[in-house]
Amino acid sequence: MKWSWLVGMSVLCLGLEISPAVATEQLVIATSPSMRIPVEALGRLFEQTHPEIRVRLFFDSGLDIRRAIAAMENSSIGQYFIGSGPIHLVAPGGDELITRLEWRYYVLPGTKRPFAEVPLVMVVPEALVDAPTSFEALAKHETLRIAVGDPELTTLGQRTRQLLTTLGVWGHVEHRLDKASDTRSVLDHLLNGEADVGILFGPDAVQESQRIRIVAVSERGIIPPVIHSMAMERYCPNRALCEEFLGFIQSDEAQSELRRLGYASPSSQSMKKRNKP
């Protein structure tokens, strides 16, 4: 991958119509397509109180983001120096990827900030009146068919099995599971009447809130959380601006917006632990 690919990368301008005369500086975030909705929302909020800043997003898969940064930094043609790179922040989706970037020093150690957790939620069609109100209640509702992601094929299914097993429910409901190949199929099975309830990730459920409703949310601490973090790219061109944005994504205003989108706020303990240099 050539470094020039990054220099000429296509970025997406976010929502506010800020005139070039007002927006004098860009803040570029490299992120994965799966993180588009929350990172866009954070960017818009930040622009509202920083009219001189235009937040732009560069999209690629987490693995390709890592490769692109590596190519940019290791190329003898396109080497950057501290404070001169094209990327400010990195939000690849999932802390495993961002930890790998830390190990390679592609992001600055000590700058990782968790901003969202991804809960599992139980959903039902809007028309269903007598719905269970907890995951544990699934064991008692012996006639309910449950749409879940296939644990052998999907992360959603693996997380669902882990949660229900930890709660002591999996063995009681396994014969009633309608296993689907992806999130879209879980929704289709539920809305087509092939299942009575479904289990999804919170953000996916919120996007379908006009057709389904959430009746239960997994509690923190039952299974290891899925955490999304953001960190400063090693050659970030404006560290003060990056630090301000990293602080903003953990603010009450930002967290309220993320909860509206179906995410959970990282625990205060998680934030403190990851904020240590």
Put a short name on every predicted segment.
Residues 6-17:
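Bacterial N-terminal signal peptides
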